[in-house]
Structures are given as C-alpha cells and as structure tokens.
Regions:
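Cell-envelope/extracellular polymer assembly enzymes that use nucleotide-activated donors
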Residues: 2-4, 32
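Short beta-strand/turn micro-motifs composed of small residues
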Residues: 7-9, 37
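Active-site nucleotide-sugar/metal-binding loop of Leloir-type enzymes
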Residues: 76-92
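Short beta-strand-to-loop acidic/aromatic patch adjacent to the donor-nucleotide binding site
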Residues: 89-101
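Conserved donor NDP-sugar-binding/catalytic core segment of glycosyltransferases
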Residues: 101, 105-116
C-alpha cells in the first residue's frame, strides 16, 4: 500500500522541526511526503530542507499563492497544488498541517486500517 502525505505550509518555522521529526521517526515511513511551501516569508523552506536532507521520500515544492485573503482558501489551493504534482498514484493520500506532531506509530495505524 502506497501512502502519501501532503502538507501545505506557510511561515511554520516555529513548529516545523518537531513536525518533520515526528514524521521521520515513524515506525513505518510514508512512501512520500510533499511539503507545499505556500509563499513563506520566514525560514520554513530552509528548515524543511535541512531536517529532511537524508530522506529521499520527503520533497518540497513551491506554490505562489494569491495575496487575496479568503479564510481557508490558501490551504486548499496549496493542497490541490500538491495533488497536481504527484507523479504516481497512491492508495492513501493524507493532508496534514505543518505544525502536526504525530505519535510514533501513526502511519502504521493508518496503513493497518486501510488494509483491514
């Protein structure tokens, strides 16, 4: 079973380290993680690159979002941008927030549920 996580991020430098480490330290790794950098103006992109440099299954792509503020719109557009950039099909696609900290066996549990 192939599982991909898409994580839209915007100015998450205060949270991204713990989030990335919680994904990297999973008992079962996802097949791919795509961070969609949605025009961050802080060090979010650099931190993602630094913490994930040894994980070839973690990628970051840049999305140029519109400046117009409509609550919830930017994150949906960033997620859809990530979906459009998938090169292969996945059985499960998850959308997580950039500040999420996952329990160590979270991905394993997700895969097990879908395999039942």
């Amino acid at each position: 079973m192939k599982l991909c996580i898409i994580i839209p991020v915007f100015n998450e430098e205060g949270f991204i380290e713990k989030s990335i480490k919680s994904i990297i330290n999973q008992t079962v790794s996802p097949d791919r993680v795509i961070y969609v950098n949605d025009s961050s103006t802080d060090n979010t992109k650099k931190l993602i690159n630094d913490f994930s440099s040894d994980c070839d299954w973690i990628h970051i792509i840049d999305n140029e979002s519109k400046e117009e503020h409509i609550p919830g719109r930017k994150v949906i557009e960033a997620f859809n941008f990530g979906l459009k950039n998938l090169k292969i099909n996945y059985d499960v696609i998850c959308k997580f927030d950039g500040d999420i900290e996952l329990p160590k066996n979270y991905i394993k549990k997700i895969k097990n549920i879908f395999l039942e």
